Amino acid sequence: MIELFYEYMFPLTVIALKVVAITIPLILCVAYLTYAERRVIGLMQLRRGPNVVGPFGLLQPIADAVKLLFKEPIIPTNADKILFILAPIITFVLSLIGWAVIPFAKGVVLADINVGVLYILAISSLSVYGIIIAGWASNSKYAFLGAIRSSAQMISYEVSIGLVIVTVLLTTGTLNLSRIIEAQKTLPWWIDLMLLPMSIVFFISVLAETNRLPFDLPEAESELVAGYNVEYSSMGFALFFLGEYANMILVSAMTTTFFLGGYLPPFNLPFLDCIPGFFWFVLKVMLLLFCFLWIRATLPRYRYDQLMRLGWKVFLPLTLFGVVLVSSVLFYTDNLPSV
């Protein structure tokens, strides 16, 4: 019996504890990211933001969660009820399981697999299905049009994201995210400089991938009322909401891992090694999240034709050229990584 416990139950218990240790703090971060967004945008617009519920409004996310929890879930009469309920669950779960391969610090990762990049790309591709199912199951023209827009937008920019990641893989020679971070310790400065335009394209593309301003066309209120989640209320709406903000944090962590050295100190300065890597990882993610909020507060929304033109006629040729340029430079300077 004891052997059975140590062989089967103990590993499963450890995995469950790791999942809980990541999921609960992540949900809290998502909740308070909404608070930070409202406060930051409020300050940028010369107003206070939420400041009534609790000291400095710190209990506002909890109040919002309680309100949504006790609201009546309304399902449209002609909706496909099973798919209608399933869609927000799919979206929220996919936004969480992507964190399994993200290294928070050296050796601190839930699943240190050798195909971590492929895992991330697969999860980001699957998230389209939750949105399509929501638009279809709602039996609403507004929701369906918002879902079609969102899926077309996400698929379009996934191409650019994938090609940018290829340039990173060319310089590091591995699909393991922990090894990608460690490889950035020894990269020459000119390779980092060569990847700088690619990192900018990547960040703009993940803005479109997460449906954030200036690319929040699926939620264009003047055209689609509220997008693919127009028929959702109560916890269904809350799960979509949490999924969107969890994806914001996830893509910020991906950008940190691929281009900012992950948990490594800035510029790989040796005297900063005494500070835990987790601190640097969180700091870099927070700076990128601030950029998300800053962009939302300052930029107007693109038209849909401008959005698609940017993805297919600007970013796709640019990233293809980037892949050819990076591979050629690495080949002729004999800096291709040995696999």
UniProtKB/Swiss-Prot annotation:
User: What InterPro entries does the database record attribute to this sequence?
Assistant: NADH_UbQ_OxRdtase_su1/FPO (IPR001694), NADH_UbQ_OxRdtase_su1_CS (IPR018086)
Which Gene Ontology biological process is one annotated for this entry? aerobic respiration
- Per the record's keyword annotation, is Membrane included, yes or no? yes
What membrane topology was assigned to this protein in its record? Answer: Multi-pass membrane protein
A Pfam match: NADHdh
User: MF terms per GO, please?
Assistant: NADH dehydrogenase activity; oxidoreductase activity, acting on NAD(P)H, quinone or similar compound as acceptor; quinone binding
What this protein catalyses is:
a quinone + NADH + 5 H(+)(in) = a quinol + NAD(+) + 4 H(+)(out)
Spell out where the chain crosses the membrane: 10-30, 50-70, 82-102, 115-135, 155-175, 187-207, 235-255, 275-295, 311-331
- SUBUNIT field: NDH-1 is composed of 14 different subunits. Subunits NuoA, H, J, K, L, M, N constitute the membrane sector of the complex.
Provide the function of this protein: NDH-1 shuttles electrons from NADH, via FMN and iron-sulfur (Fe-S) centers, to quinones in the respiratory chain. The immediate electron acceptor for the enzyme in this species is believed to be ubiquinone. Couples the redox reaction to proton translocation (for every two electrons transferred, four hydrogen ions are translocated across the cytoplasmic membrane), and thus conserves the redox energy in a proton gradient. This subunit may bind ubiquinone.
Q: Which NCBIfam families match?
A: PRK06076.1-2, PRK06076.1-6
Record's protein name: NADH-quinone oxidoreductase subunit H
* Source organism of the structure: Rickettsia typhi (strain ATCC VR-144 / Wilmington)
